């Protein structure tokens, strides 16, 4: 049989294949690489949280794509809200979606799929469950520290084994840096400096 990957064009395998193709058949062409390859989605979300000018215009919702909007009801919407939540206030999240998705109890099943409470994962381009759990743990911890009542979905998540496991692990993604990449120097050093380690931790509210 043949390996099928509808996300092949986003993979490191494609990046390597096209890089080699360019070297062999397109001499003198651009050096092809992904500057985001070394980073986790958690770190990318953290960096993007500081790009305030784009918060009103970015989209990552398949359902609302034709209307250039967020539907506010799908796994993509809830994942993006979750991965951004350690870095933005609840009011900032509300402004992006027009509501606080964590207050929408109809999204509980999707939250359970994103965090691994349910075995089935959404058939959408969403990040890893470990990243979602880390993000939600940090968000719950911050809200409790600030004395802010947990919205319905986070209150439910607070009672789960997934929360307890994330609590034990803590923030395991701020220091992440995947050395399997084609990022050349000095760009690699720049990515590490701006998006990993202490700079990444500073963005957590």
Range-by-range predicted roles:
Residues 1-205:
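Nucleotide-activated chemistry modules centered on ATP-dependent adenylation/adenylyltransferase
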């Amino acid at each position: 049989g043949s390996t099928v990957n509808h996300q092949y064009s986003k993979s490191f395998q494609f990046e390597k294949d096209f890089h080699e193709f360019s070297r062999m058949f397109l001499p003198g062409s651009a050096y092809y690489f992904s500057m985001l390859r070394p980073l986790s989605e958690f770190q990318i979300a953290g960096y993007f949280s500081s790009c305030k000018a784009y918060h009103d215009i970015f989209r990552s919702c398949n359902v609302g794509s034709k209307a250039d909007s967020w539907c506010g009801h799908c796994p993509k919407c809830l994942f993006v809200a979750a991965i951004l939540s350690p870095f933005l206030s609840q009011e900032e999240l509300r402004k992006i979606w027009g509501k606080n998705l964590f207050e929408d109890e109809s999204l509980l099943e999707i939250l359970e799929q994103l965090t691994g409470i349910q075995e089935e994962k959404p058939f959408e381009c969403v990040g890893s469950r470990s990243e979602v759990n880390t993000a939600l743990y940090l968000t719950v911890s911050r809200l409790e520290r600030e004395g802010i009542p947990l919205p319905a979905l986070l209150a439910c998540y607070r009672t789960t084994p997934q929360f307890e496991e994330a609590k034990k692990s803590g923030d395991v993604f701020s220091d992440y840096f995947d050395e399997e990449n084609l990022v050349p120097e000095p760009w690699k050093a720049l990515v590490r400096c701006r998006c990993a380690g202490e700079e990444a931790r500073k963005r957590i509210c």
